[in-house]
């Protein structure tokens, strides 16, 4: 008897928690980007939602959720700068590939009218990819990086 199953894909997004009290408009921006990003995941897989991670504790919680669900793959959306402590606890105990999605929302900045929250929320592809890749390498994790400009969400 053939049983149809779907691959289980853990999905989460990260941002530096220290930015949020300084720039509260980033919260709805990041929530909207993350919701749009999740919609790009095909319904041919079972999405396990780890949420938006801004602290080590939230990363650990996402990792617990991924382990409990026995995910086959993890996809991480980098919303803005974040350190690897936002990522590593979520994937450290998993033996699955990790895909870092590092895209900025807008292709061309309007420099004359760009403020810090706009830069951090819509124009900044994460500069911490190197740190995260190095940590994934040290942890022996299979990984890939997708980087560039989002076509659309």
Task: Kindly give the residue locations of the regions a language model identified.
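Metallocofactor- and cofactor-centric catalytic cores in central/energy metabolism, strongly enriched
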Residues: 1-153
């Amino acid at each position: 008897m053939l049983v149809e199953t779907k691959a289980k894909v853990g999905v989460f997004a990260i941002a530096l928690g220290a930015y949020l009290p300084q720039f509260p408009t980033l919260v709805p921006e990041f929530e909207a980007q993350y919701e749009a990003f999740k919609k790009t995941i095909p319904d041919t897989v079972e999405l396990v939602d780890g949420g938006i991670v801004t602290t080590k504790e939230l990363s650990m919680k996402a990792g617990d959720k991924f382990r409990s669900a026995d995910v086959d793959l993890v996809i991480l959306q980098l919303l803005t700068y974040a350190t690897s402590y936002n990522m590593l606890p979520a994937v450290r105990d998993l033996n699955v590939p990790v895909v870092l999605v590092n895209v900025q929302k807008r292709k061309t900045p309007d420099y004359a009218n760009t403020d810090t929250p706009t830069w951090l929320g819509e124009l900044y592809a994460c500069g911490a990819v190197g740190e995260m890749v190095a940590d994934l390498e040290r942890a022996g994790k299979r990984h890939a990086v997708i980087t560039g400009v989002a076509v659309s969400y």
